[in-house]
Amino acid sequence: MDLNTILIILGIIALIILVVHGLWANRREKSQYFKSANTFTRDSRLREPPAHIQSASEEKKDANTSTPTAEVSPAQRTFAFEAEKQFAHEQQAVEQAIENIKITLPKEEQPYQAKIEPDTPPTSPALTTIAEVENYANQEEGIDTHSEQLRQQLADLAQQSPSVTLAALQEEQALMESQAQQQASEDVRQDTDATFIMMYVVAPENYQFQGARLAKILDELGFLFGEHNIYHRHSDLSVNSPVLFSVANIEQPGTFDYNMHDFSTVGIALFMQLPSEGNDLMNLRMMIRAAKSIAEDLGGFVLTDQQAIFDDQAEKAYLDKVR
């Protein structure tokens, strides 16, 4: 049960108890002033004094039995009338207070019901032509679009805001799709044209190239440690010049450590992207000479991209790719 409802019920019970106690107290007070509540009338209230006055009279009679019975004085009658008037006024105030008590229980909240409305695209006068407005008016509202005044208003509206027909929107969308497809085709063509020529220099079995010696040889051949943490051979030995070919580590993740003294690898990969800066044939010959120099100095072997021994026949096949 809700806490508010429990508090309201407890308040009602407490209020009823207070009202009953008040009525009981009033009746008790009433019995002190009157002999009988059932025979109590306005005339009897005026004729008979209250109980405490009668008891006082009786005590006086007992004290002085020889004294004749004393009659009720006008002052005593006035006191009794005022007491009864006050009691009636208090009882009327209690009854009026009970009638004015109004207790309202909180209304139960109705469950929220979401109204699902169909999604309808907003209509805009700028997206319709005069003919479309006339067609819509004839079909939906039954408006007489042959009226000269209405046609003039439609013409003024069309001049104030440019109209875009559905056919124009479809044509623009088709043009955008065509441009996107053309751009995608160019990107694919560029990726296809950008081929790589690769060869490997590997250490003998159960051996590795030490980083310090490898770095020294690469420096002597003009390689510079740079982008992607690999070595690059630039056209004029400057990091700002175009890259001719590069050297990467064949072990994952394919990079070299900046501190090559603690580095070792089983082999390296030399690769050149075609077309390259300048003459592709000259750049390829330079890369082949660099691979042979590294293998000779480190005691390794030069392999093709198919991991075959790079001999004279393989060299001729490589050079034929760029001729």
From Swiss-Prot:
Residues 44-73 are annotated as: Disordered. The keyword Cell inner membrane applies. Keywords: Cell cycle, Cell division, Cell inner membrane, Cell membrane, Membrane, Transmembrane, Transmembrane helix. It is found in: Cell inner membrane. The chain crosses the membrane at residues 5-25. The keyword GTP-binding does not apply. It is a single-pass type I membrane protein. Essential cell division protein that stabilizes the FtsZ protofilaments by cross-linking them and that serves as a cytoplasmic membrane anchor for the Z ring. Also required for the recruitment to the septal ring of downstream cell division proteins. This is Cell division protein ZipA. It comes from Pasteurella multocida (strain Pm70). The gene is zipA.
